[in-house]
Amino acid sequence: MYEIDDLVYTDAGVYWNAKGVKRFEEYIQMLKDGEFLITFQSSYLEKDYSKGDILKFTGHYNDDNVLMSLQLLSGIVIIKKNAEGMRFVEDWYELCHHHFNLISDKVSAVPCIRGFVENRHDQSALSLLAKQRRHIEISYKETLPLSLDWSQMEAFPIQARQYKKKKMQWKEKHIFELKKPYMALIAWYLKRYKHFYFSPTTKVYW
């Protein structure tokens, strides 16, 4: 990438809506107007999806304004390649690669905030680092309607709905079922000996 290029990142499977090109151009104009980081909200509170360790490390543990704000998505982000944008990416990389315990499912040494559900890994890192600096937040209403009525979303370019996966063939399904005891054993090992946790809704796959 060249200096001052714009990086638009979305997870594989995120739906791009061609009818939303006008709004997408508005996102890019925000960067031209001097912003360097455009983030997109999830519909969940930060305190519920970031464990105590990472909240303390990033200086947000006692900051109610951050704790009660909506967590930002790591699967949709727009960054300008300038000094500020590069610093943000470097900080994100540093935290994820050199402080892995902060983004892992290991039980937090620092007590989690009441209502905690689970840590969101690199997303918790991106969200909390973004909130340390100037950034734009696009409302979750532009990426995910709570009613799941996607017909409301024609004006918006980036939508957090996944393309449907191909239905598994009989052989693939059979192999997957046979692997379940192995996956359960690994999950038990991680919980028992590595002090990881998994919420009741977490699916553990390898």
Sequence positions of predicted segments:
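Glycosyltransferase catalytic domains, chiefly GT-A lineage
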Residues: 1-206
